[in-house]
Amino acid sequence: MKISVLGDGAWGTALAMVLVANGHDVTTWGPFPDYLEQMEKERINSRFLKGVKLPDELKFTPDMAVAAEADWLLTATPTQYLRGVLDKLKPYFEPERHAVINVAKGIENGTLLTISEMISGVLGPCRYCTLCGPSHAEEVALQVPTAVVAASTDIELAKEVSNLFMNDTFRVYVSDDPVGVELGGALKNVIAVAAGIIDGMELGDNPKAALLTRGIAEMSRLGAALGGNPATFAGLSGVGDLIVTCTSGHS
């Protein structure tokens, strides 16, 4: 498959490596031509993913028209910059041909839109899937066993996305609840801030356990109120992502 990764950060790069390892034709798009040229020449993402050699097959382009030649478009841009990237993509976007896989997490500042709402607002109705779960980019790039979930209202699309990424070290489950999966990836960050405060104050394990337990309960209730399935928050994109964010030194 021909896939373009829109974003040259750590997560986009790590997922590009997974896709290349699976035999796909992958191009990374980024906004800074000089940095893309450096990555292409040195085969390392020195800003965001140090110490990991990039595969020779991975291609780079600063030209959105070239990136849009792929049928699969993976949005791996930080949420607050994603709208600008979508605006660049819009002139080339063909909803009958393209499918969008989003891996960014969060809520848009100011509008409070979820990422799927932002994408449909800019690009219009499209084939959309979100990929989320407990997955540090550094570990994925080093082929540490990882499990995530692909979610779409079109379960067959979610299965297609799962097949794109699935290999011996990267397991992808499927879900028909993109709202719940997206909200899990966003809401856990609020709980993670509180977990960091507990660590900083050296309060011990008891309050953190209470925080995580009550935090996932609140995430489930809010997620249900916003249209998600409460059961989704007991999965990889809910409690899984919450645990890895609140307990890891990476965060």
Enumerate the language-model features and the residues they cover.
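Alpha-helix C-terminal capping/helix-to-coil transition sites in glycosyltransferase folds
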Residues: 68-69, 187, 239
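Internal alpha-helical scaffold of NAD(P)-dependent oxidoreductase catalytic cores
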Residues: 81, 92, 118, 122-127, ...
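Rossmann-like NAD(P)(H) cofactor-binding subdomain of soluble oxidoreductases
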Residues: 54, 60-145, 161
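NAD(P)+-binding Rossmann beta1-loop-alpha1 motif at the extreme N-terminus of oxidoreductases
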Residues: 1-52, 61-62, 88
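C-terminal substrate-binding/catalytic lobe of Rossmann-fold NAD(P)-dependent oxidoreductases
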Residues: 227-251
